[in-house]
Curated annotation (Swiss-Prot):
Ranges in a coiled coil: none
Pfam families referenced in this protein's UniProt entry, alphabetically: DUF896
Any Gene Ontology CC annotation: cytoplasm
Family to which the UniProt record says this protein belongs: Belongs to the UPF0291 family.
Protein's name according to its UniProt entry: UPF0291 protein YnzC
C-alpha cells in the first residue's frame, strides 16, 4: 500500500493544481503518484472481492462461478 507521506504529497499537489500554480514537473509527479495509489487501491479491492461470498435472501450461495473459481484457485473458500 502507498505510504502516508505519498498520500500527503498527492494532496499537496492537488491543492497546487487547484490553485493553478503547479509546474509541468509536478504534474508528472502527481500523475505518477496517482497511478501508484490506484494500483494499490485496485489490488486491495480485488483481494477484498476475492473473499466475498454472496448469499440470497433464502440463504442460497449465489456467488458467481468466476469468483468461486478464483477462490478455489487461491484456496479462500
Amino acid at each position: 500500500m502507498i505510504s502516508n507521506a505519498k498520500i500527503a504529497r498527492i494532496n499537496e499537489l492537488a491543492a497546487k493544481a487547484k490553485a493553478g500554480v503547479i509546474t509541468e514537473e509536478e504534474k508528472a509527479e502527481q500523475q505518477k503518484l496517482r497511478q501508484e495509489y490506484l494500483k494499490g487501491f485496485r489490488s486491495s479491492m480485488k483481494n477484498t472481492l476475492k473473499s466475498v461470498k454472496i448469499i440470497d435472501p433464502e440463504g442460497n450461495d449465489v456467488t458467481p462461478e468466476k469468483l468461486k473459481r478464483e477462490q478455489r484457485n487461491n484456496k479462500l473458500h
